[in-house]
């Protein structure tokens, strides 16, 4: 019995030991699996670290590349700035050189003008001794302050009985403007070109007929020596008198509406066209200092004035073409130009009506000097150029501009 119990205890012990060993083996098996998982996790971690490292390297390379591009761009910008600065410096140097050349030209022109005036003085006053060392500018100044009115006084002491006497100056466009009208009307007139260097324009006898002491001035000897000053007033007096005496509105009109338009253009020329060109010439050649803003301002204003005239003449030409070539008027109005109309491009057109008037002729002398302020009317204002060319071909205009 005891022996059986002993044997049974032994079997239980063995059974428990086997179970324990089995559990140990199972535990070892689980432990092996965990270690395998740990190895896999470690490998993945290494792989991730390598990926991260590669990403960092790529990012660093990208940053370096971007930095290089920025550096290249900065260098290009610096080079461009340097180039712009060099160009600006070159432009400034060129402008300075141009200004110096213009100043030299102005000085030469002033010297030539002074020499011319001095030469005239010596010819007209050979016995007038000038002290040594006196500059030409001082002599010109003295001549401007002194008045030699002997020639003017002699004229007024023995005036003509008929015709007209025009007081003008060799370089006065407004004087030639009046001469052109007198010549076109075939009126008998004599011209006295005043010598400003002698102060003839300030002679008491001349100031009596023109209190402004400028040219032109006109004496109508047929009307009890009536004196008229200001070019526009002189022109209107002459054309109206001619119309009343002959009944022919030559250079004028018998239509009141056209007369108003002629007056408008005549006043536009005397108040806007002539003064702007005169000021542009003054600041470009004769002003004591170079004032670019003044030169530009008056030159631009002259261009604006010519733009007004150009538009008016272009409208007159369009009306002429549509009237003379009625068959193609619709095509021309639509913006096309048939070959049949090309022959009309050189036809003369006028500011008022279908004939030349004093409104047109008043522009001629000033149009002849506008190139001296850098305006090429042939290129910039083709209608003005053709208009001026037609007037310059007229025999009366040629005669007047020659001072005959």
Swiss-Prot record:
Plays an important role in the cellular response to the nitrogen source. URE2 gene plays a major part in the repression of GLN1 and GDH2 genes by glutamine, and is required for the inactivation of glutamine synthetase. URE2 gene product may catalytically inactivate GLN3 in response to an increase in the intracellular concentration of glutamine. Residues 162-246 form the GST N-terminal domain. CDD domains: GST_C_Ure2p, GST_N_Ure2p_like. This is Protein URE2. Residues 255-404 form the GST C-terminal domain. Residues 110-134 are annotated as: Disordered. InterPro entries: Glutathione-S-Trfase_C-like (IPR010987), Glutathione-S-Trfase_C_sf (IPR036282), Glutathione_S-Trfase (IPR040079), Glutathione_S-Trfase_N (IPR004045), GST_C (IPR004046), Thioredoxin-like_sf (IPR036249), Ure2 (IPR017298). Pfam families: GST_C (PF00043), GST_N (PF02798). Gene3D superfamilies: 1.20.1050.10, Glutaredoxin. GO terms for biological process: nitrate assimilation; regulation of nitrogen utilization. Signal peptide: none annotated. It comes from the Eukaryota. Belongs to the GST superfamily. PROSITE patterns: GST_CTER (PS50405), GST_NTER (PS50404). GO terms for molecular function: transcription corepressor activity. Keywords: Nitrate assimilation. Homodimer.
């Amino acid at each position: 019995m005891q022996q059986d119990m002993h044997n049974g205890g032994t079997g239980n012990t063995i059974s428990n030991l086997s179970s324990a060993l089995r559990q140990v083996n199972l535990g070892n098996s689980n432990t092996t699996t965990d270690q395998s998982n740990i190895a896999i996790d470690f490998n993945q971690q290494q792989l991730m670290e390598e990926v991260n490292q590669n990403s960092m390297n790529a990012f660093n390379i990208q940053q370096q590349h971007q930095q290089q591009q920025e550096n290249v761009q900065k260098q290009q910008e610096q080079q461009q700035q340097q180039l712009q600065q060099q160009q600006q410096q070159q432009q400034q140097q060129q402008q300075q050189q141009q200004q110096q050349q213009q100043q030299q030209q102005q000085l030469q022109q002033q010297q030539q003008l002074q020499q011319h005036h001095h030469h005239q003085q010596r010819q007209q006053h050979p016995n007038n001794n000038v002290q040594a060392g006196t500059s030409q500018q001082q002599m010109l100044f003295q001549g401007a302050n002194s008045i030699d009115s002997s020639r003017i006084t002699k004229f007024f002491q023995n005036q003509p009985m008929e015709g007209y006497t025009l007081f003008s100056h060799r370089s006065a466009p407004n004087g030639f403007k009046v001469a052109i009208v007198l010549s076109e009307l075939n009126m008998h007139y004599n011209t006295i070109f005043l010598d400003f260097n002698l102060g003839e324009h300030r002679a008491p006898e001349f100031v009596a007929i023109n209190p402004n002491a400028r040219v032109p001035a006109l004496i109508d000897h047929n009307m009890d020596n009536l004196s008229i000053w200001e070019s526009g007033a002189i022109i209107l007096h002459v054309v109206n008198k001619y119309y009343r005496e002959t009944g022919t509105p030559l250079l004028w009109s018998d239509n009141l509406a056209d007369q108003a338009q002629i007056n408008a253009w005549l006043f536009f020329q005397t108040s806007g066209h002539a003064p702007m060109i005169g000021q542009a010439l003054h600041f470009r050649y004769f002003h004591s200092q170079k004032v670019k803003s003044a030169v530009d301002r008056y030159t631009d204003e002259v261009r604006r004035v010519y733009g007004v005239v150009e538009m008016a003449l272009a409208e007159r030409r369009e009306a002429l073409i549509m009237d003379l070539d009625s068959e193609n008027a619709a095509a021309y109005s639509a913006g096309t130009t048939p070959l049949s109309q090309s022959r009309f491009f050189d036809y003369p057109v006028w500011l008022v009506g279908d004939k030349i008037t004093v409104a047109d002729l008043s522009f001629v002398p000033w149009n002849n000097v506008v190139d001296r302020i850098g305006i090429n009317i042939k290129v910039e204002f083709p209608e003005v150029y053709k208009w001026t060319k037609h007037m310059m071909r007229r025999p009366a205009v040629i005669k007047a501009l020659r001072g005959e």
